[in-house]
Amino acid sequence: MTTITFFRSDGIFYGFEESGHVAYAEYGNDPFCAMLSSVTMYIVDAIEEVYGGNVSYDINEDDTVITVRSRSALPAYEADERVRFAVSGLFLTYYRMLEDMLLHDDMYEFTKDSGFQIKVKDLDF
């Protein structure tokens, strides 16, 4: 089971932590884990390379935990509102995509020990 916890401050998403293994298939062959990893790196690269924002990320393969946070989503740290909206929009879009997948989880054959869940933690940066 993978848990994706989104970090939010004053209603603005600024990061997330992914932990665990979806267990839809064997480690290394799981399309859901591959999707989560791909979207995660897309978000990191977009913040750094496209929007010129500040992003920190940590990948702990031993514990299967990935943490991504960006101050550029928050008005206290980023003056350019276009960057703020773009960065926070990436996090919000990821959240909504996962939320939508959970609404249609009958399309996937998860066992009781596999799948994913999403949470939101209101936490200052």
Name the predicted role of every residue range.
Residues 1-30, 45-125:
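N-terminal intrinsically disordered, cationic/polar leader segments
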Residues 32-36:
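Short, conserved glycine- and acidic-residue-centered signature motifs
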